[in-house]
Amino acid sequence: MLSRATRTAAAKSLVKSKVARNVMAASFVKRHASTSLFKQANKVESLGSIYLSGKKISVAANPFSITSNRFKSTSIEVPPMAESLTEGSLKEYTKNVGDFIKEDELLATIETDKIDIEVNSPVSGTVTKLNFKPEDTVTVGEELAQVEPGEAPAEGSGESKPEPTEQAEPSQGVAARENSSEETASKKEAAPKKEAAPKKEVTEPKKADQPKKTVSKAQEPPVASNSFTPFPRTETRVKMNRMRLRIAERLKESQNTAASLTTFNEVDMSALMEMRKLYKDEIIKKTGTKFGFMGLFSKACTLAAKDIPAVNGAIEGDQIVYRDYTDISVAVATPKGLVTPVVRNAESLSVLDIENEIVRLSHKARDGKLTLEDMTGGTFTISNGGVFGSLYGTPIINSPQTAVLGLHGVKERPVTVNGQIVSRPMMYLALTYDHRLLDGREAVTFLKTVKELIEDPRKMLLW
């Protein structure tokens, strides 16, 4: 049988282990509990610390309990993207470890080949873990962060901050500096003084008495023959973002895959500009839409594609895909690069409906709010370089599409009409197409049809 002393020592050890567990639990609860529970935890922690230091006090046996489910962290993962996207680059975290985040509040932004994806927190709580750094590559399903569910900390509660160490008051600091300076002065006085060297008295003549110096040309300092200052030659290296990298890959892929060829034509914009001038104010008043050129050109392309369906088709393996719908990809320039949001079923929309959709998508693109759905698909692309002053150019096919139409600037040029030289607002059109699917005759016919519809917009009513 164990002796009484041995049993007593074992009991004390057991009590200490229970207190230690309670103290650790109290420390954990203080970081995450409500105000009332925080006070209770603080009391347990202080009492337990006293007991563990050797003083005899009574400690309640576990006055509160912590369950793993109550404080279990929520894992936040990289969300699913489009079928063609499986990874991206972490652009930034909006929170740091220890910060409180509300439910549905933005936690991180992921940059993909097409758009930026925002990741929101599914719960309210404290951020306990961030697994990546900006510019790290993240894949779908990977854990981005962990959030421990909980309420927002009340004002005045939370971990007690360590009291600042006492600092000497300014007056004390000044006195200390004065004392140190006095000690230094006394030390200097105690040191033997060196005999001062006799100073030579120098009498400077007055300005009026000073003789004027005459400098001959031979005595003048020589001027540097080469006073050229080199121009700065600095270089700055900036890492390409994922969108720019993807654009570069796709454009090169298009050049390597398609048998690209470009055909040109010019269109007289007089009738379209006159119609726009007549109805512009009325359209803005009724619909709030600015009547531009893109809606009419898009509609003209959908009508011309009915006669030349290969323009709207695609090559997939050893098959040609023909479509009875036309999804127009509209090229929009953004600070991060060129994007091509899609106007769905443009063949079924009116000119104003197309114009409205283009304006909506353009605003979303410039604000960085495009979704993957806005960017997916597209059967034919229109690029309007004329808004930037382009006169002439050859666009690149937006693979896997078959053709792209490039619009250029409207310029007044002399043209011959009925034997007379007149000035007309003219625009160059450029159609780049994949010669594997589209023959030259079909490409020229398509572009000629677009030209005729734009030069006489009333013909669109006949289709």
Swiss-Prot record:
The active site is at H435, D439. It catalyses: N(6)-[(R)-dihydrolipoyl]-L-lysyl-[protein] + succinyl-CoA = N(6)-[(R)-S(8)-succinyldihydrolipoyl]-L-lysyl-[protein] + CoA. The modification Phosphothreonine is found at T340. Its cofactor is (R)-lipoate. It is found in: Mitochondrion. Pathway: Amino-acid degradation; L-lysine degradation via saccharopine pathway; glutaryl-CoA from L-lysine: step 6/6. Residues 73-148 form the Lipoyl-binding domain. Signal peptide: none annotated. Its EC number is 2.3.1.61. Keywords: Acyltransferase, Lipoyl, Mitochondrion, Phosphoprotein, Repeat, Transferase, Transit peptide, Tricarboxylic acid cycle. One of its GO terms (cellular component) is mitochondrion. SUPFAM superfamilies: CoA-dependent acyltransferases, Single hybrid motif. Residues 144-237 are annotated as: Disordered. Induction: Transcriptionally regulated by glucose and activated by the HAP2 and HAP3 proteins. Component of the 2-oxoglutarate dehydrogenase complex (OGDC), also called alpha-ketoglutarate dehydrogenase (KGDH) complex. The copmplex is composed of the catalytic subunits OGDH (2-oxoglutarate dehydrogenase KGD1; also called E1 subunit), DLST (dihydrolipoamide succinyltransferase KGD2; also called E2 subunit) and DLD (dihydrolipoamide dehydrogenase LPD1; also called E3 subunit), and the assembly factor KGD4. Present with 7970 molecules/cell in log phase SD medium. This is Dihydrolipoyllysine-residue succinyltransferase component of 2-oxoglutarate dehydrogenase complex, mitochondrial. It comes from Saccharomyces cerevisiae (strain ATCC 204508 / S288c) (Baker's yeast).
